[in-house]
Amino acid sequence: MKVAGADEAGRGPVIGPLVIVAAVVEEDKIRSLTKLGVKDSKQLTPAQREKLFDEIVKVLDDYSVVIVSPQDIDGRKGSMNELEVENFVKALNSLKVKPEVIYIDSADVKAERFAENIRSRLAYEAKVVAEHKADAKYEIVSAASILAKVIRDREIEKLKAEYGDFGSGYPSDPRTKKWLEEWYSKHGNFPPIVRRTWDTAKKIEEKFKRAQLTLDNFLKRFRN
């Protein structure tokens, strides 16, 4: 029986893409993933994940990757959950080897609803199980999670080579916030790697626009 797992990396950052990976393997090869030490990707360092990447790919029958750009995230018509459903389905439908059972790390507080939303849009018949923290429960989801994180880390390194070191890209990172403020101060806008609909970006934009408005009003009074 073919078993698939799907997970994402990069839902929360204000900078960079969202990466979704679907991975499929013959059920009796899951023990090979266990032997590799595949587990919840959050428990592994970036170096450990990078080291596991090629080993995981060798075990898998197939995997697919969907990269969702900041522009697509900002331009979404519905919620982030709906965007994830759409792109999880895209990744699962892209698999050349179709699974009979699919395990997914649920982005929805109602895991069963998340599973049904995906199952109903698949181009093939499969049982879909969505659970919270599935990446810590099922090796095939852990494998998908590791691949997604490594692919996103590689994308982030490319962006840093072009735009400079913006830290982790998460709103809670002071380096990221400092980089965003400095970039906006210098250019009067954000580059395409930034999710402009995120509160962090919106607040910085509003702050600079208020400052500019105050300056404009001051200069207007001075000229009068």
UniProtKB/Swiss-Prot annotation:
Instruction: Please list the residue ranges annotated as the RNase H type-2 domain.
Output: 1-210
Task: Cite the EC number.
Answer: 3.1.26.4
Reaction it catalyzes: Endonucleolytic cleavage to 5'-phosphomonoester
Q: Does the keyword Ribosomal protein apply?
A: no
The cofactor note reads: Manganese or magnesium. Binds 1 divalent metal ion per monomer in the absence of substrate. May bind a second metal ion after substrate binding.
What is an example of a Pfam family matching this protein? RNase_HII
Cellular compartments per GO CC:
cytoplasm; ribonuclease H2 complex
Residues given in the record as a divalent metal cation binding sites: 7-8, 105
As for subcellular location, the record says: Cytoplasm
Q: Which SUPFAM superfamilies match?
A: Ribonuclease H-like (SSF53098)
What does the record give as cofactor?
A: Mn(2+); Mg(2+)
Q: What class of enzyme is it?
A: hydrolase
Q: Which Gene3D superfamilies match?
A: Ribonuclease H-like superfamily/Ribonuclease H (3.30.420.10), Ribonuclease hii. Domain 2 (1.10.10.460)
- The protein's superkingdom reads Archaea
> Is Thylakoid found in the keyword set?
no
Similarity section: Belongs to the RNase HII family.
Q: Which HAMAP family does this chain map to? A: RNase_HII_A (MF_00052_A)
Biological role stated in the UniProt entry? Endonuclease that specifically degrades the RNA of RNA-DNA hybrids.
Matches recorded under PANTHER family: RIBONUCLEASE (PTHR10954:SF23), RIBONUCLEASE H2 SUBUNIT A (PTHR10954)
Q: What is this protein called?
A: Ribonuclease HII
Q: Which gene encodes it?
A: rnhB
